[in-house]
């Protein structure tokens, strides 16, 4: 080989070398049969485990999505294992029929609890498998912030994946493969109507992901999307302000407080301005329409302790939900999108939140746009991360890429 020919090797770019190293470090893809998948209905929580009765493969992956407020874990257990126990193995045997996808959620402020949970999963699994075969796929900002800690404490391969790509991939799989996952809310009866993905999953559509903040993604094809907007006023805003204004210690406690609240004791309504039972009919504003969130607080000049925590919680929840709903509508109008999917742990399948978002979309669009929700709305990212390294049946679910 001549000196010139040898010199060609020095022209390989650093980016090319990094790409090759990345491909070599990737774990082998696991097989996951999603045919016949169903949500397990005989459990208390709404974000239930997903049964995979036809999966017979050995699954050695764990996925985690670590956001600013919450960390979500997804893992696979065989059907004989307890889905809620931290001692459950990831996959207990080579020869068994069926299993389930299980989900857990932790506060990011208590990330050590999350890491310990994953460590317990791994330790139990090591009894049946070489630890080197186990891979953690991490996404979200915490995948970078806590990368060194997870790698050191878990002592397994940790791979980081793009947050937005995982969100879209998770949405694709939930909508395409999981029956009774997507639904709409009736504004009059608050009844849920589950959707057939063939009827509702059209392009373009929008994903409004509401976590600590809000990201709005426009999906233009089976594997193309772009981030078109967002807001800093999201779940973290609600959590932070209610931590200051109420005795609630967790997000779920805040949502529970809001269920028993009366926002009219703190919100100024159209009727408070025009007179009781009088609205602004010219613009379709009923007397019960909120004119100013927290508008009565200054006017009444009462100390904080004289306002019920329940009323404050409901008012702030409505304020943030209304704001997100209107922003979502404006982006959908600008980009000519009719179908809007709402995801993220802020929603928590909370009826008042979904009702407010649905009302905002229908009101501002004059009923020309649709608001869709998911039962696993907080797990889009972690599901997408999990499926990044899985070969699935059905095999026609698209893999996203940033536009």
Curated annotation (Swiss-Prot):
The record's annotation in Pfam families points to: Fumble (PF03630)
Q: Does the keyword Nucleotide-binding apply?
A: yes
Pathway stated in the Swiss-Prot or TrEMBL entry:
Cofactor biosynthesis; coenzyme A biosynthesis; CoA from (R)-pantothenate: step 1/5
Gene Ontology cellular-component terms listed: cytoplasm; cytosol; nucleus
Q: Which SUPFAM superfamilies match?
A: Actin-like ATPase domain (SSF53067)
From what superkingdom does this record's organism come? Eukaryota
InterPro entries linked to this entry: ATPase_NBD, Type_II_PanK
Query: Where is this protein localized, as stated in its record?
Result: Cytoplasm; Nucleus
Per the UniProt entry, the Enzyme Commission number(s) are 2.7.1.33
What is the activity-regulation note?
A: Regulated by feedback inhibition by malonyl-CoA.
* Keywords attached to this entry: ATP-binding, Coenzyme A biosynthesis, Cytoplasm, Kinase, Nucleotide-binding, Nucleus, Phosphoprotein, Transferase
The reaction(s) annotated as catalysed by this protein in its Swiss-Prot or TrEMBL entry are: (R)-pantothenate + ATP = (R)-4'-phosphopantothenate + ADP + H(+)
Any one Gene Ontology biological process term?
A: coenzyme A biosynthetic process
Modification type Phosphoserine: residues: 80, 82, 84
**What are the disulphide bonds in this sequence?**
none
Q: Name one GO molecular function term.
A: pantothenate kinase activity
The family this protein is said to belong to = Belongs to the type II pantothenate kinase family.
Q: What is the role of the protein in this entry?
A: Plays a role in the physiological regulation of the intracellular CoA concentration.
Q: What protein name does the entry list? A: Pantothenate kinase
């Amino acid at each position: 080989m001549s000196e010139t020919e040898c010199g060609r090797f020095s022209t390989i770019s650093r980016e090319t070398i990094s790409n090759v190293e990345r491909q070599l470090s990737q774990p082998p893809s696991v097989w996951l049969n999603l045919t016949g998948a169903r949500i397990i209905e005989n459990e208390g929580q709404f974000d239930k485990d997903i049964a995979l009765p036809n999966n017979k493969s050995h699954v050695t992956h764990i996925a985690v999505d670590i956001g600013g407020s919450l960390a979500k874990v997804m893992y696979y257990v065989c059907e004989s294992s307890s889905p809620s126990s931290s001692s459950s193995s990831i996959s207990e045997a080579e020869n068994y029929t069926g299993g389930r996808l299980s989900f857990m959620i932790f506060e990011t402020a208590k990330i050590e609890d999350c890491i310990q949970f994953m460590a317990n999963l791994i330790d139990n699994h090591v009894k049946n498998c070489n630890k080197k075969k186990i891979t953690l796929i991490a996404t979200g900002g915490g995948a970078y912030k806590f990368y060194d800690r997870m790698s050191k404490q878990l002592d397994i391969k940790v791979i980081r994946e793009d947050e937005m790509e995982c969100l879209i991939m998770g949405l694709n799989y939930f909508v395409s493969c999981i029956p009774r996952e997507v639904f709409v809310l009736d504004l009059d009866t608050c009844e849920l109507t589950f959707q057939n993905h063939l009827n509702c999953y059209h392009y373009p559509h929008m994903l409004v992901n509401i976590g600590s903040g809000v990201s709005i993604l426009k999906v233009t094809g089976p594997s193309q999307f772009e981030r078109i907007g967002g807001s800093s006023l999201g779940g973290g805003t609600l959590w932070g302000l209610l931590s200051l204004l109420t005795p609630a210690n967790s997000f779920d406690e805040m949502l529970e407080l809001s269920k028993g609240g009366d926002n009219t004791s703190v919100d100024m309504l159209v009727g408070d301005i025009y007179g009781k039972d009088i609205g602004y009919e010219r613009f379709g504003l009923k007397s019960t329409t909120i004119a100013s969130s927290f508008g009565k607080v200054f006017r009444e000049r009462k100390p904080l302790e004289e306002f019920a925590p329940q009323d404050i919680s409901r008012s702030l929840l409505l304020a943030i939900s209304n704001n997100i709903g209107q922003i979502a509508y404006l982006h959908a109008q600008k980009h000519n999108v009719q179908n809007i999917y709402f995801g993220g742990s802020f929603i928590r399948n909370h009826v008042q939140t979904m009702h407010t978002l649905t009302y905002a979309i229908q009101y501002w669009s004059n009923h020309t746009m649709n608001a869709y929700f998911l039962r696993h709305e907080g797990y889009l990212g972690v599901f997408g991360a999990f499926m990044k390294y899985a070969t699935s049946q059905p095999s026609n679910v698209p893999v996203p890429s940033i536009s």
